[in-house]
Amino acid sequence: MANINLKEITLIVGVVTACYWNSLFCGFVFDDVSAILDNKDLHPSTPLKTLFQNDFWGTPMSEERSHKSYRPLTVLTFRLNYLLSELKPMSYHLLNMIFHAVVSVIFLKVCKLFLDNKSSVIASLLFAVHPIHTEAVTGVVGRAELLSSIFFLAAFLSYTRSKGPDNSIIWTPIALTVFLVAVATLCKEQGITVVGICCVYEVFIAQGYTLPLLCTTAGQFLRGKGSIPFSMLQTLVKLIVLMFSTLLLVVIRVQVIQSQLPVFTRFDNPAAVSPTPTRQLTFNYLLPVNAWLLLNPSELCCDWTMGTIPLIESLLDIRNLATFTFFCFLGMLGVFSIRYSGDSSKTVLMALCLMALPFIPASNLFFPVGFVVAERVLYVPSMGFCILVAHGWQKISTKSVFKKLSWICLSMVILTHSLKTFHRNWDWESEYTLFMSALKVNKNNAKLWNNVGHALENEKNFERALKYFLQATHVQPDDIGAHMNVGRTYKNLNRTKEAEESYMMAKSLMPQIIPGKKYAARIAPNHLNVYINLANLIRANESRLEEADQLYRQAISMRPDFKQAYISRGELLLKMNKPLKAKEAYLKALELDRNNADLWYNLAIVHIELKEPNEALKKNFNRALELNPKHKLALFNSAIVMQESGEVKLRPEARKRLLSYINEEPLDANGYFNLGMLAMDDKKDNEAEIWMKKAIKLQADFRSALFNLALLYSQTAKELKALPILEELLRYYPDHIKGLILKGDILMNQKKDILGAKKCFERILEMDPSNVQGKHNLCVVYFEEKDLLKAERCLLETLALAPHEEYIQRHLNIVRDKISSSSFIEPIFPTSKISSVEGKKIPTESVKEIRGESRQTQIVKTSDNKSQSKSNKQLGKNGDEETPHKTTKDIKEIEKKRVAALKRLEEIERILNGE
């Protein structure tokens, strides 16, 4: 076995770098979104064991909607990327490029088993630059192919060392081969096919058998005229070990998918659901299509599903000629490779094996796959193609007549392939560029029109997105997903009538209800979202809530394990004020997915509605944060529950969670505001001031932050600093009653501006004539103005509003005594005492605001059809409402203030009585 040298490695790595360096500037596109951005298995908070329970896309293998692609080792490398750079795509693309270089170098070593040094380097160069590999290398999810190929080739190289002197068996390389096959299979399923290549290598290369020799030996043995040679028995033992190991891996793999194949729609692979002979003719035609992509990769497309390749429905279809030609050529090469024993036939045989065997899982031979053509599955088969081309070039270049021409042609192929690969990488820069490049190749694929629409939709360009979605419905009128996309876009454009019509059209395309029929086997999971989307749309109308609930129940009846339907129904039931039923829906969803942080969060909201804050906090919010320590809504709202509980011991944890929240959401003023409220509760006035100012800096019109900052200044003897804050508050909210009361108090007591205070109290009564606090304070203003008769009338009106308030009656009696004695010379109410009459004037314990902005309950929505509908659920009370819970300490403080107010009232009464 020839070794590879440093020059060859440098050449290969340099060529790979030159072709793929621009891929470092591409983002996450197409399948990368599901496998990387939306895959929670990448997050450090997800237990490692979960990687071995979920499929490649992060869906539990036990779920019917799972793709059943089991590649935990590939996901593990994604997780390592995430650990190093989180979701920055450059590191992911860099590692892919490195893996491709490694594969190319190992492939060079494999080539030297069958080709001379020069041809081996050429084959490796052809492989390194082939444009068909851009999907596998530049698309991050193509790493499954890259990793699997590394262990695929390593397993084969290990097996080539299993033959010892005198044809003896060396078991260590065989054991290593089995291990590497298992690893390759855990990277991608096609890794297991290397066992077939090892078997072919053992029989036809290592032992040098040909088909005629095998037939002769078998015939003699069956006729009893001879025995099986010992070397052949040894070969048989090795083959049995390989086959048994393979069978064991297959059994384990079947157990992993729980003997279930993934559910695909007829749009994913139209031929798979077509009748005979359409299915067979089309499947066979796909073989020359794939071969042509290897031979002429000029028109590449990221998606070959739906109507990309029309079905072959007749034997008279001209495309059958391509199928016939392909099989003739393949047959001739096959006969040549297994009939003759020369080096050339061995090279051709191994090339054909590398082309054919790894392609079998994607060939629809044993089971239908979810695509028509996929360029990245040609990554390993292209190795055999490159060996075949290099071997052919070797044969031609040895003839002096064609030597120069062969070098020119080879150089042109490598150069053009390199340029094509480099240019093709730019198509993968973004989803929009990728799908637009695909539409240049194929305009009959509705999925491509949909995907361009999705790319524009992500940019909030709904008008343009709608055009592409509508075109998708024209290209494929029975595409349920396209009509759902149209409906969602109409909804985003606030055209609800058209949105409902589109959803109804999609719903009409769903299979009709058949009693006793199991729908899970016939309906793609994402298509059931039409019921969810339609229900989410119509439930905006309060009169149609029952109709929406019926849609959710219909979806559940079709798929009892449809988690999203339970989640959405639970949200609706909360809106219908049925928290107990909502709780049942969420608990059912939790039975299907107990590791969903959003579900635990939603259940916490239900317990809040049921007035069970302790249950919400201890069991649900905390569980959500165990599963996802960065769950923003759980961090925020659990902190609010702790704060509102009034338990001093919970305040440090509430503060910790709010600090984590602002770390995740640094631009949300609510986090800073609630930190300020916690600081006020802890009497940390300076800290509270800092947090409130930060909240106001982020949101200048933050009603609650403005008022509570002014209140803080008022409580800390900084009334004059409170005044400009109140002016700002009343500029945004001129009807803010408590702000007007506080402003009037400061104007009366600090600024001695009786007229300004009077305007504040009069403004309050314009908005709320029955406001006792404002009315009484206005009476005090009249008293200060020495208008006793007006003060008397005012107090009478106030007493009518609050007949049980004794202090109003006493003040009325005092005023009447003053009128009757006619001894009114100077102001009887000292302005410095006004704000404390009976504790009714700006009682600080009753004006603290506990919430600035309502928060949203995040409801998990199925993302297959990019449904983004969310529902609001307010936690806590609005900004001007009083604190709902008081601790014993708070109550004592309030009582102290009330007693102090009574003492001040006695002082006022003594002054009124002339004492």
From Swiss-Prot:
Residues 1-8, 115-120, 159-166, 215-231, 339-353, 398-404 are cytoplasmic. Pathway: Protein modification; protein glycosylation. It is an enzyme of class 2 (transferase). One of its GO terms (molecular function) is mannosyltransferase activity. GO terms for biological process: positive regulation of proteasomal protein catabolic process; protein O-linked mannosylation; response to endoplasmic reticulum stress. It comes from the Eukaryota. SUPFAM superfamilies: TPR-like. Residues 30-93, 188-193, 253-317, 375-376, 424-915 are extracellular. The keyword NAD does not apply. Keywords: Disease variant, Endoplasmic reticulum, Glycoprotein, Lissencephaly, Membrane, Phosphoprotein, Repeat, TPR repeat, Transferase, Transmembrane, Transmembrane helix. Belongs to the TMTC family. This is Protein O-mannosyl-transferase TMTC3. The lineage of its organism: Eukaryota, Metazoa, Chordata, Craniata, Vertebrata.
